[in-house]
A protein has these predicted regions:
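Juxtamembrane helix-loop-helix connectors linking adjacent transmembrane helices
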Residues: 1-17, 41-109, 119-124, 254-257
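Membrane-interface helix caps and helix-loop-helix hairpins in membrane proteins
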Residues: 83-86, 143-152
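N-terminal, membrane-interfacial amphipathic/helix-forming hydrophobic leader that caps
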Residues: 1-42, 46-49, 190-257
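Small-polar-interrupted transmembrane alpha-helices in polytopic inner-membrane proteins
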Residues: 103, 129-145, 158-159
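Functionally important transmembrane alpha-helices
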Residues: 154-215
Length: 257
């Protein structure tokens, strides 16, 4: 189909500026509100830079990417997914770079607000821990409710991954692990393996087709987040985080500021 000359999807850098500008604006808005309305230090959100937090970040990057890679492999091996090109002929494009930048910004933006700002503000008001988890995950899920091709099961899984991110934040007292997981979960999903990301169009290294009869596993047009495999790996992420945090020697979610 012919694209209009000002269609931003035809110009990846314009698309990045349009989408990324709003995301960066959201980051600064959250930080400014936290600093000047909540009157707290920025690092108190869980953004302190130190070697331990960077290890958390790397673990999050690994866990998010590995989870989505295993979903891809399982669907491929069971015949629920097929490639339009060879696995050894990935299609690198400018989208590989622009969406990496975008998903890095999205990871920071959503974790700073949905985990950092919401949970820490509620904690400062002496809400119970379970309420911190539930409200953060619920608001996170509802935020995605207007996405294209949204499904009830997709929103449930987004709520579940919100709980996982909350647990990562709780277990490490840092945003760095959920930020890392969030970045690679999205990027590997859409820009490596070519799945829709929460219902939005992918620009992957691979073009794929999924079996229409296997929507319960693949998530259909919403992407893997709308399928049972994502549910399994989100739950597995809780156990992986628990094992990691025990080795890390972290305590419970308590403010140091």
């Amino acid at each position: 189909m012919h694209r209009e000359i000002f269609d931003p999807g035809y110009y990846p850098w314009i698309e990045l500026l349009m989408n990324g500008g709003g995301v960066v604006g959201a980051i600064f808005s959250s930080l400014l509100i936290w600093r000047y309305i909540n009157k707290k230090k920025i690092v108190a959100l869980g953004l302190e830079l130190n070697s331990l937090n960077m290890k958390d970040f790397v673990f999050g990057l690994f866990l998010g990417g590995a989870s989505m890679t295993l979903i891809f492999i399982l669907l491929l091996l069971t015949g629920q997914l097929s490639l339009k090109v060879s696995l050894f002929a990935p299609d690198f494009s400018i989208y590989s770079l622009t969406f990496l930048i975008l998903f890095i910004a999205v990871g920071f933006s959503e974790e700073i607000f949905f985990r950092g700002y919401i949970m820490k503000t509620m904690e400062d008001r002496h809400n119970s821990k379970w309420l911190l988890y539930v409200m953060s995950a619920l608001i996170f899920s509802l935020f995605h409710g207007m996405n294209p091709n949204v499904s009830v099961f997709g929103l449930i899984n987004i709520g579940l991954v919100g709980l996982l991110f909350s647990y990562m934040y709780d277990a490490t007292k840092s945003l760095w692990m959920p930020i890392g997981y969030h970045i690679t979960w999205n990027y590997f999903q859409g820009n490596v393996f070519g799945f829709p990301v929460s219902g939005t169009d992918p620009h992957g290294l691979y073009q794929i087709t999924t079996e229409s009869s296997a929507k319960l596993l693949t998530g259909g047009n919403f992407g893997p987040e709308g399928g049972l495999l994502a549910t399994f790996f989100i739950i597995a992420g809780v156990f992986a985080t628990n094992m990691y945090s025990k080795k890390r020697g972290s305590g419970s979610f308590e403010s140091k500021y």
